[in-house]
């Protein structure tokens, strides 16, 4: 099964190398460039999150899970993909299209790492959306029900579940498209439903009748914190949607015909957007949270020897 999975991927690359070589070259450069960017950004964000004293504990753990998976996507996934693509481009430039040495190990390992880490990133964002929903829905009971141990257990289970899903994915090469489509649509629906509810509640809070304002005065600081956290998570979700929704659409196209060159190309483009998500998430953290932004700036100054 693993050999079949690898051969299918290799066939796709053979098609793109013959028909869309400049696009593959662009992918190679972009993947290697954003691999470095994602690695550096997420290292800085992980340090900032660990040093933060104002970010809610549960949210910090969730952001750490997301940042670590995004770091690994850049450091391992994108860099491996960029290097393998560069090898294929160099060999075929000399007229050598014998790329069988890449299977069954190299391509399988590369895509297994990518699928595993993007799966963790995908579900971490969904978990953040659900957590922001619980903050508003449970309010005062949130810390009683959503404890630190439960968050750690949930995310440990998430990482293990993504490992199992990756194994299943590589073992079902003929059904992998449907498998990924089901996972993506379920995740997109859960995250979208959560944020629709979150912002319907926030809108009602911002339009409270004047005579009721004094009743909420004592909770205003907590409410503002909740709104800021929800807004930050919502920006993560918007980027997430822009990066993952095109991939779902391309998967739907491939279900109709896996041999159409334009569909294969579109799927690789949407795959790059999925990887790009790991470079965009850290920017959102730094932009929305003043303390994290300050810690990142100080870290950069130290690295660049700027006083």
Task: State each model region's role.
Residues 1-44, 85, 90, 306:
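Extracellular N-terminal segment of 7TM GPCRs
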Residues 1-15, 54, 203-225, 290-307:
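Intrinsically disordered regulatory tails of 7TM GPCRs
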Residues 20-32, 59-127:
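Extracellular TM2-ECL1-early TM3 structural module of rhodopsin-like
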Residues 43, 75, 79, 229-253, ...:
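Hydrophobic alpha-helical segments of membrane proteins
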Residues 69, 200-247:
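Intracellular effector-coupling site of seven-transmembrane GPCRs
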Residues 116-154:
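Class A GPCR helix-loop hinge within the 7TM core
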């Amino acid at each position: 099964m693993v050999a079949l999975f690898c051969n299918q991927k290799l066939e796709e690359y053979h098609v793109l190398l013959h028909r869309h070589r400049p696009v593959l070259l662009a992918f190679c450069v972009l993947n290697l460039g954003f691999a470095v960017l994602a690695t550096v950004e997420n290292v800085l964000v992980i340090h900032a999150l660990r040093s933060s004293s104002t970010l809610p504990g549960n949210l910090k753990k969730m952001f750490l899970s997301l940042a670590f998976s995004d770091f690994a996507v850049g450091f391992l996934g994108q860099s491996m993909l960029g290097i393998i693509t560069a090898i294929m481009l160099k060999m075929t430039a000399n007229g050598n299209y014998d790329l069988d040495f890449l299977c069954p190990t190299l391509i399988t390992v590369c895509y297994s790492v990518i699928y595993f880490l993007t799966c963790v990133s995908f579900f971490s964002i969904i978990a953040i959306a659900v957590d922001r929903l619980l903050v508003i829905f449970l309010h005062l009971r949130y810390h009683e029900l959503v404890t630190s141990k439960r968050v750690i257990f949930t995310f440990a289970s998430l990482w293990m579940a993504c490992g199992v899903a990756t194994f299943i994915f590589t073992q079902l090469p003929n059904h992998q498209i449907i498998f990924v489509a089901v996972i993506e649509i379920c995740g997109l629906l859960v995250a979208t439903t959560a944020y629709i509810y979150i912002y319907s509640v926030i809108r009602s809070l911002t339009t409270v009748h004047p005579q009721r304002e004094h009743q909420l005065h004592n909770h205003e600081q907590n409410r503002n914190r909740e709104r800021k956290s929800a807004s930050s998570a919502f920006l993560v979700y918007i980027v997430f949607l822009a990066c993952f929704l095109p991939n779902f659409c391309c998967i739907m196209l491939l279900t109709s015909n896996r041999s159409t060159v334009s569909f294969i190309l579109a799927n690789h483009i949407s795959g790059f957007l999925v990887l790009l998500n790991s470079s965009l998430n850290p920017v959102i953290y730094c932009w929305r949270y003043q303390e994290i932004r300050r810690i990142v700036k100080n870290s950069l100054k130290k690295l660049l020897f700027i006083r």
